[in-house]
Amino acid sequence: MVKQLKFSEDARQAMLRGVDQLANAVKVTIGPKGRNVVLDKEFTAPLITNDGVTIAKEIELEDPYENMGAKLVQEVANKTNEIAGDGTTTATVLAQAMIQEGLKNVTSGANPVGLRQGIDKAVKVAVEALHENSQKVENKNEIAQVGAISAADEEIGRYISEAMEKVGNDGVITIEESNGLNTELEVVEGMQFDRGYQSPYMVTDSDKMVAELERPYILVTDKKISSFQDILPLLEQVVQSNRPILIVADEVEGDALTNIVLNRMRGTFTAVAVKAPGFGDRRKAMLEDLAILTGAQVITDDLGLDLKDATIDMLGTASKVEVTKDNTTVVDGDGDENSIDARVSQLKSQIEETESDFDREKLQERLAKLAGGVAVIKVGAASETELKERKLRIEDALNSTRAAVEEGIVAGGGTALVNVYQKVSEIEAEGDIETGVNIVLKALTAPVRQIAENAGLEGSVIVERLKNAEPGVGFNAATNEWVNMLEVGIVDPTKVTRSALQHAASVAAMFLTTEAVVASIPEKNNDQPNMGGMPGMM
């Protein structure tokens, strides 16, 4: 394919137009009075959302240079979402502010490498100051506040807080769509282990890249499955029952894996293969846990059992199994209650007896998976459009609360970034490095400025007053009042704020040091002339 090139100022200005188009679409959503964005969906109803990363992913521009600029900011949103699970709009606003301010200085003759050094220096100091100002999340009420601020809904914050209380901070919390109007919380018995599907062709939902199996059979074995013939008799019985199957084995490979994938793609049956969790003796113990939870029989040479002789009665069952690239969650296994209780008691005894800290930790993990549970937040809404929007907000809020538990919380509403302004301004630097520090200083005020503007106020006035306010005191755009943000529960997770700043600075620095851009020239489709009719035909 033929390529076209742009250099220096032409290249950067073209990319800046793309940055601005994407950022302007995203930043209208920030703050309590932020607006929604409507996304056109080709085969379904339009999606109404205020989720930054969802909006960013949808944007594709016609001009290849502008599109590259937009993709750079998409990367900021994606990375922030990947690390912290929220804060994508803040990251986008920060990136745009740094790129715009940086480009003014590059155009005026500043050295981009010096600017980059200044940006890196300033961000390092800002992150250290954020951690110094961070407070630990210590109770259920604070967790609820984080969730409520992220989702702009107190009810959602309460549900997440209750879910984390019931299954623990590291417990498994899933979000499902409900058929009703109300959002509800359920805690279901379940087990999760860190093994995902062996082939992406096994997924049932290609948008989320997840395999969801309803009422599946579950085969549990410590054997390697290489030959499809070994499991064919068993699969024939499963096909007759018209139910999916989860295969948990040491490994599924060779023609066994090929045939499972081919039959899945043809629609003959739905099967998902995952590797057994753990290693060595611990793997056998974890397979036994899974078998007891689901009512399965472990197919193993230790018991003289062979895959060819396995019957459907040896399989376990569960109400639902969800398999992602990295994890498998078994919900509501049909194992015998007495057997599960006996296994739990056995694990508790082993925890008391063991002298190894490592073994104790692993036993406690197994106990939590067996006796703990999976919290399910069932999202209800009046329409499909509202349901999707609400589900996205709950996912963001859940990620925010987990991030808050991990690294603590800081004052929300962009206040935390302005609170570190003083520390960053004290950095001793000169020349282009000092200019780089000033770029970050201006960007630190951008989220507050945008939140104020979305609330119909003059951003510059709010920023100047905030710079002179006591640490922690900020502007509540929902009520137009100046309050102590931490005291009234307007908080952001430190991890979210930190990640947004770091990823925005990283992409801005790369943008400013770009000197040439190479893009593909779109191929033009020449219209084919209409073919004339054959002689004698009408």
UniProtKB/Swiss-Prot annotation:
GO cellular component, one term: cytoplasm
Enzyme nomenclature, EC number: 5.6.1.7
Signal sequence bounds: none
Presence of the UniProt keyword Cytoplasm in the record: yes
Origin: domain of life: Bacteria
Alphabetized GO MF terms: ATP binding; ATP-dependent protein folding chaperone; isomerase activity; unfolded protein binding
Subcellular location: Cytoplasm
GO biological process terms, semicolon-separated: protein refolding
Residues the record lists as binding ATP: T29, I30, G31, P32, D86, G87, T88, T89, T90, G413, N476, A477, A478, D492
Coiled coil spans: none
Catalytic activity: ATP + H2O + a folded polypeptide = ADP + phosphate + an unfolded polypeptide
Keyword terms, alphabetized: ATP-binding, Chaperone, Cytoplasm, Isomerase, Nucleotide-binding
HAMAP family the record matches: CH60
Function: Together with its co-chaperonin GroES, plays an essential role in assisting protein folding. The GroEL-GroES system forms a nano-cage that allows encapsulation of the non-native substrate proteins and provides a physical environment optimized to promote and accelerate protein folding.
The family this protein is said to belong to: Belongs to the chaperonin (HSP60) family.
Subunit structure comment from the entry: Forms a cylinder of 14 subunits composed of two heptameric rings stacked back-to-back. Interacts with the co-chaperonin GroES.
Name of the featured protein: Chaperonin GroEL
Source taxonomy: Bacteria, Bacillati, Bacillota, Bacilli, Bacillales
